[in-house]
Amino acid sequence: MTRFLFLVRHGDASPHDGPLSPAGQEQARLTGRRLKDVPFSAVYHGPLPRAAQTAKLIAASLPGVPVTASELAGDYIPSNPDPEDLPRRFADFVASFPAAERAAGAARAEAARERFIRPDDGAPDSYELVVTHNFLLGWLVSQALDAPPWRWLGLNQMNCAVTVIACQPGLPAALITFNDASHLPPELRWTGFPATLRPASI
């Protein structure tokens, strides 16, 4: 009765808010090949083109699995933390978004947490894939680990890296893997990731 939530950040896009770049398309295809044997019951993706296109390319390796757009998997600020709780750089970043946008994002993120980070009381084990964006992915990981609500800040994912969270009745959620890009060749890793956080020779 374990519920496995697979989270994938969209592929590299060019421009950032546009469709996938050629590299992003290849990242998505390779991610689909990696996940082809996982018995998914559903694939969800954010409504923006880069997430929708990534999901479509992944789903090409998952015949018969329904693919659905979801606003919950979109690109938004997932919490509205007190600036006093944040490092200054994070506080300035959050403050750059309008208050109404932050409030709406926090409500949507809570709905996403309730929808995706929950145990499955049925049997057998279940598997779902969510193709989403950096902020929400970090938020879901932070919530699975009972971290402070603002701790999605600084949790960065590479494009098309795979994160897996397992939920079981009566137990805290378990982070199985985070930001795993081992299915991508070196030249397709680390896109979308802050250069200042990339370790040398990895």
PLM segments and residue spans:
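Phosphate-coordination/substrate-recognition cap region in phosphate-metabolizing enzymes
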Residues: R29-A100, S201-I202
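Active-site metal-binding loops of divalent metal-dependent hydrolases
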Residues: G11, N134, A181
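Acidic, low-complexity terminal tails and accessory targeting/binding regions
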Residues: M1, G64, D75-D85, P124-S126, ...
